[in-house]
Every structure is written in C-alpha cells, then in structure tokens.
From Swiss-Prot:
Function: Involved in protein export. Acts as a chaperone by maintaining the newly synthesized protein in an open conformation. Functions as a peptidyl-prolyl cis-trans isomerase.
Gene Ontology terms: cellular component: cytoplasm
Record-given protein name: Trigger factor
Gene: tig
Organism listed in the record: Oenococcus oeni (strain ATCC BAA-331 / PSU-1)
Reaction it catalyzes: [protein]-peptidylproline (omega=180) = [protein]-peptidylproline (omega=0)
Domain observations: Consists of 3 domains; the N-terminus binds the ribosome, the middle domain has PPIase activity, while the C-terminus has intrinsic chaperone activity on its own.
Residue stretches making up the PPIase FKBP-type domain: 170-255
Main location: cytoplasm
PROSITE patterns documented for this protein: FKBP_PPIASE
Gene Ontology biological process terms, A to Z: 'de novo' cotranslational protein folding; cell division; chaperone-mediated protein folding; protein transport; protein unfolding
UniProtKB keywords: Cell cycle, Cell division, Chaperone, Cytoplasm, Isomerase, Rotamase
GO MF entry, a single one: peptidyl-prolyl cis-trans isomerase activity
Coiled coil ranges: none
Annotated compartments: Cytoplasm
Length: 439
C-alpha cells in the first residue's frame, strides 16, 4: 500500500509567474532521511576505537549532534516530498526550485519554502482541420532537365582547352605563383604546378577573378589585399603582388545526353528514355516525401502560432532546459558516430559557444510547440497505454541496437509517456489537417 505523504502545501503567487511554495516534511520522512544521512556519513567518520563504518548511530549523535545529519537528510528526502507538495498545491512548475529551509527542528515537522517558477498557461486556437498549403508532388520538365544536367556534370571530365580558348569560372588552371609584400617574398606565398579551380574560393578574394580571361602560357601579375582578419597576422590587411604563370588550362567537357550516357550513369537502363522515366520516378518520390514533411511542419506551426501563451515571455528556466537537452542530444549523436566534440568543432571551425547560440535561437519556438502539444494531449485526454510504452521501448532498442533493459535504464517511463503523448498530439493535428493547393 502506497504511503500518502501530507505536506500541508500552500502556494503564494509572486510577481509574474514566480511564487512561493510552502510545505512541511512530516516526522516519519525526517526519521527516514536521518537514517539515510547517517548511513552515508558513517563510512567517512574517524572515531578513536572504532573502524570506519562501524560507529553506532547513538554514538554518532552523542558526539556530533543530530543537526550534523540535517543537510544530507534533507537532500535525501526532499525530491519526493517536493513533488508531493507541488501536486498538493495543484500547480505546474518549471526549472529547479530555490529551497529555503525555515525551521529544521528535532522531531519535525520541518518547514520549507521553495521559490518556484510556474509553467505558462496555454489557450489553444484551432488545432483540428487547419488548412495548410501543400506543394504539388508532380515533377515538371524543368526539374527533370535540371536533374539530368546534374547527372551530366557528374560525368564531366577535365580536358585541355583549345589554343584560342580563354579561362572562365569553373575552369581549372595549373599555375606557378610567387607572392611578395613590399617587394619581399613571404612564407607560404610560393608554389609550382598548383591546380586551381577558378571560382572555388581557395585563394583570398580577388586572386581567382584576375586569372579569368587568360590562356595557357600567359604570365599575370595578380594584385590583392589580404583580409584584415587573415590568420597570418604579419600579412593581415597588407597589399601583395603574385607573379603567376599559367601552364595549363582545362575545361569541363560534359557528355552528350544520349543512350550511351544513360547506360554509363545507370547500368540497369538501356536507353535515355528509360533513364528519364526512372529519374522522374525517383524525383517524384523524393518530392512527395519532402512535401509531406513540409506540410506536417506547417500544420504544427500554424497550430502553435494560433495558440496564446501566458506569460508571452517564456521563463528563462524553460529556455535553458531546452538548450541543455538539445546540446546533450547533439553530443550523444556525435558520440554515436564516434566523433568527439573537440574534433567536430575543429573540423567545422566552430565552437561550443557558437553551437549553444544556434540552439538558443530556436529554443523559444521549440518550447512553445511543446507547451501547445502538451495542452492538446491534456484536452484530448491522450494517455499512452503500457502496451504502447512497451512497444516504444522495443522500437528504441531495435533502432540503437541495444537491450530493452538498457533503454529502460536511460529513459524513464514518464519520459517515454510524455514523448508518446506529444507524438500522438502531432498525429492528431496532421491527420486532420486540410491540404490546399499552393498558389
């Protein structure tokens, strides 16, 4: 039989969505907490004549006093008591409370005050049958031709340019270059037979542009200014001249769009018409999937935009919690791919602070979306069954190739139930949404 704890909880509203939750911890729970605190501390206490961990509770209390156990006792029992007090006061809170013990005395009850932040309230707008624009899944001739052109470029080869041809963006030149600043050479400013794709942005701004319009064999003086934030501080912001010799000019030659090309691209077809049909079918499938995702996102966003949140400014605690979860999920995904955060930041040239800023920008909408979906689940009385939770555990175990017991250890039943509630609220919105043709 479950032992119901009575906390005599009361809530006093403060400014905005802040307030004070006052409650009591009964003697029975205090006694349990003191026992837990003693068991935690006894292994660390040195008392002459006793081995560590073998001192009696009576001797401990006589020597140090019961008050020495109060802090650990409170930490041990507070989480469950606090949850009960929140339920008793019939409030919904977010973030971590600021706990202020008021009267911790022998035998109790202990009086506690908790400065808390109330969750925003949600006033739903329409969420069933919302009208949302949807793109056509049909593939146009323009889209098909663009994809065939992409396939052509994928099969293109670099070939030597003709004598009368000049360089253009997209061409490749093989060059020698020798750079100088104020007439003096500098480290890293010289190379031979360097292959450069014009327009690739490999060199500092202005360098590649000045090699456009030339032929193989030309000598060109390229005049540029190093960016002020250039990594080599001794060159940053300075003017430079590069003596460049163009040894070779190569142009991309794309294959003809014919039956032979079709067979080279896909050995399962024997003609260009077959390739076109297969390509169009794939494009249609991809487009339908993309349009479906966009339709679902737009339907959810329309419902979220139509809801009113009070207060409109979301609690900072909710934003911070969301960002922390997003960061943790991101790092977990990296770990699953065998990538350490330091390696990721090095490869991408970003930092953890930049990633956090990126996550923070989307946090308000994510939090509002979650609040709205939770309210829909409440109004619609969506409560996942034990069978649905078990099915989700099996699904996660299969997806991540781990045992079901490992899923249960890492994700609580409450979290799974919440995720399923939100998921089913999403399905309710999407399944009832009305698609209208995009104008």
């Amino acid at each position: 039989m479950v032992d119901i704890i009575k906390t005599n909880a009361t809530f006093k509203a403060g400014k905005g969505n802040k307030g004070t939750l006052s409650f009591e911890i009964p003697a029975k729970q205090i006694s349990s907490g003191i026992d837990q605190a003693f068991n935690k501390q006894k292994d660390k206490i040195n008392i002459p004549g006793f081995r560590k961990g073998h001192v009696s509770k009576e001797l401990f209390l006589a020597r140090f006093g019961e008050e020495a156990l109060y802090e650990d006792a409170l930490n041990a029992i507070l989480p469950d008591i606090y949850d009960q007090a929140v339920n008793e006061a019939d409030i919904t809170v977010v973030g971590q409370p600021q706990i202020i013990p008021d009267d911790l005395k022998h035998g109790g009850p202990w009086k506690i005050h908790a400065e808390v932040t109330l969750a925003p309230t949600v006033e739903l707008g329409d969420y069933k049958g919302v009208e949302v624009e949807k793109e056509s899944d049909e593939v146009s001739d323009k889209e098909l031709n663009a994809e065939l052109e992409r396939l052509q470029k994928g099969e293109a080869e670099l070939v030597p340019a003709k004598e009368d041809q000049v360089s253009e963006k997209g061409d490749t030149v093989v060059i020698d270059f020798d750079g100088s600043v104020d007439g003096k050479q500098f480290d890293g400013g010289k190379a031979q037979n360097f292959s450069l794709s014009l327009g690739s942005g490999q060199f500092i701004p202005g360098f590649e542009d000045q090699l456009v319009g030339h032929k193989a064999g030309d000598d060109v003086d390229v005049k540029v200014t190093f960016p002020k934030n250039y990594q080599a501080k001794n060159l940053a912001g300075k003017e430079a001249v590069f003596a460049v010799t163009i040894h070779e000019l190569k142009k991309l030659e794309t294959p003809a769009l014919d039956n032979e090309f079709a067979k080279d691209v896909d050995d399962s077809v024997s003609s260009l018409e077959e390739l076109k049909a297969k390509t169009k079918e794939k494009l249609a499938k991809d487009k339908a999937e993309k349009n479906k995702d966009a339709f679902e996102d737009a339907a959810i966003q329309k419902v979220v935009d139509g809801a009113k949140i009070n207060p409109e400014k979301l609690p900072e605690e909710m934003i911070n919690d969301d960002v922390s979860r997003q960061m943790q999920t991101f790092f977990n995904n990296l770990a699953g791919q065998g990538v350490k955060p330091e390696m990721y930041f090095q490869i991408t040239g970003t930092s953890q602070e930049q990633l956090k800023q990126q996550m923070t920008e989307g946090a308000p909408n994510r939090v509002k979306t979650n609040l709205v979906l939770e309210e829909i689940a409440r109004v619609e009385k969506i409560n996942p069954s034990n069978e649905e939770i078990d099915k989700e555990i099996k699904s996660l175990a299969s997806e991540y190739n781990i045992k079901e017991s490992e899923v249960e250890k890492s994700v609580s039943a409450g979290m799974l139930s919440h995720d399923l509630k939100v998921q089913q609220a999403v399905e309710l919105i999407v399944n009832s949404a009305q698609a209208v043709e995009k104008k």
